[in-house]
Swiss-Prot record:
Pfam families in alphabetical order: VPR
Keywords assigned: Activator, AIDS, Cell cycle, Host G2/M cell cycle arrest by virus, Host nucleus, Host-virus interaction, Modulation of host cell cycle by virus, Phosphoprotein, Transcription, Transcription regulation, Viral penetration into host nucleus, Virion, Virus entry into host cell
UniProt-recorded name of the protein: Protein Vpr
A GO BP annotation: viral penetration into host nucleus
GO CC annotation terms, alphabetical: host cell; host cell nucleus; virion component
Chain positions found as Phosphoserine: 84
Predominant location: virion
Keyword Cell cycle attributed: yes
Amino acid sequence: MAEAPTELPPVDGTPLREPGDEWIIEILREIKEEALKHFDPRLLIALGKYIYTRHGDTLEGARELIKVLQRALFTHFRAGCGHSRIGQTRGGNPLSAIPTPRNMQ
């Protein structure tokens, strides 16, 4: 199997490209849409607020939220989500161990 060629810096000396802002935002929209099908919206709002207070409105915050939601969905599916063909027949909410903030019911 041939190795993929390494990316070289552009001739004009600009840095190597990163995934575009639009790509990260699109991935976040998709994973958030999927998470809303499986988790309590209040929990997702609390998670979003927590990450926003840590990272603000930055791409780093978006990446962190993507990472947490991916892990939560993976764990949920492996435990046996009722909507999924992965894992067993039923699964619990892996985020239920996170305490609900006092001002949320």
